[in-house]
Amino acid sequence: MEPNSQRTKVPAFLSDLGKATLRGIRKCPRCGTFNGTRGLSCKNKTCGTIFRYGARKQPSIEAVKIITGSDLQVYSVRQRDRGPDYRCFVELGVSETAIQTVDGTIITQLSSGRCYVPSCLKAATQGIVENQCQHIKLAVTCQAEATPLTLKSSVLNALQAAPETKQSLWQLATEPTGPLVQRVTKNIMVVKCKASQKHNLGYLHASFMQKISSRSLPERRFFCSCQTLRPHKSSVPKAEAAPKCIHFFACLCAFASDETLAQEFSDFLNFDASGLKEIIVPHLGCHAESSVSACESAASKPRKRKKDEVSGAQVNSSLMPQDAVNSNLRKSGLKRPVVTSSLKRHVCGQLLDEAQVTLSFQDWLASVTERIHQTMHYQFDGKPEPLVFHIPQSFFDALQQRISIGSAKKRLPNSTTAFVRKDALPLGTFSKYTWHITNILQVKQILDTPEMPLEITRSFIQNRDGTYELFKCPKVEVENIAESYGRIEKQPVLRPLELKTFLKVGNTSPDQKEPTPFIIEWIPDILPQSKIGELRIKFEYGHHRNGHVADYQDPRPPMDQPLELAPLTTITFP
């Protein structure tokens, strides 16, 4: 009776329309809600999938400055003739040119640039283009800066990949040449890489695209500049798809390190076919084990065709931080697995075993190296107070072993002094052993650790108020461009203002007679029952300005200047 009653409600002039079709509507690939084909986003508010951007979409950013951590000025510039997703690199700098005049020689600074688009490089070498190309002009007027993405070491350590891959990622992330991953546009990232003939600056572009089709699941596309672009119509089976490069995993680790990015790029983190099964982001909190049990229970259930994406998000929920997983579960309407109270008590009430809390010698030595780095500041005079450490005897034995590396026997101290301490604690008679190191390479060999290599020089920039700020200097060796671009190499070297401090060890100037020592002093048994001794490190450092030794200048104003106070006035009340 009900179907007949519904048919009677149809007006007579619509009775001959025929069978209903799906013309003009389409299903949302994520939640299955029917939407109009002209719709920009899903009308299901809990879904919010964006189908396409409207006509008022903001244009792609023309030029973005890359954070290099040095004086090197690198820009990511859009190639207008190729589309919004094609970008290139431009390097800007300042070069000094001497001009001979009647009055003498005038040294002027000229802004110059180098565009790394092959066509622009070729045109510059052949002398076809006299003025700057359009990419350099865009870089000169650039005011936008890339957004650095944080990479958590816990995420990188949890990456179930080859040790070589993790080691390469860690080396790139710890190099003082800016962040590992930077966001240039919504879909394009700039990733650090090893400098090569193809990537001279040590950076490349990586893009994450998502093409949504009305008849199938979203198609996720990743392209990296280190890969060769396949023909558009070539069909490559999923089983034969090329493995993802190291830059792809670098971006995913950066996405998983931030909750907002993990939600935005959850499709890439959750996608099984892209080879992300091996990436696991560690969870923090009491419900870490419950999330694992949820994954196992979801994986044990058979997957249905209509719930492919829901089950996929459930299986790979370990790819995202816990909050992101919870938000996805709320959106999809799934119930969280029940966690028994005994499990909660076991996870939350787990006590820290004090016997397992240890500090290795290399971790301690890395802290010493970091103290030396902090002390070598351009704003101070280069003669710091001794660095004092209280360490066990075993740590100093390991340090003394490093001091003796290269010699057949244990190196004896340069001097041994016995002294009586009466004016300060602890009181008593102590022995002090002193080593003088006059070779900078030996100092670096003693203090180098995998986590914290010793930096012999440190770079700084001067602020407007006269203070100085640390500016990490790059160590990227840019290989020569092809021989066909030989004329570019003959351009003057770009040398911006350089402010550096350097460790004074040995003879640092031609007229120096006595070498400057790096002094290590050891006083054992300051705490005799605990076997703790006192280690003192004394050193000096100098200042460089544009490659020349500069005298220290105190940026602070002198305190002996009299203050000028306005005269007081007498106010009379009527």
Swiss-Prot record:
It comes from the Eukaryota. Residues 297-317 are annotated as: Disordered. GO terms for cellular component: nucleoplasm. Pfam families: zf-tcix. Transmembrane segments: none annotated. This is Uncharacterized protein C2orf42 homolog. It comes from Mus musculus (Mouse).
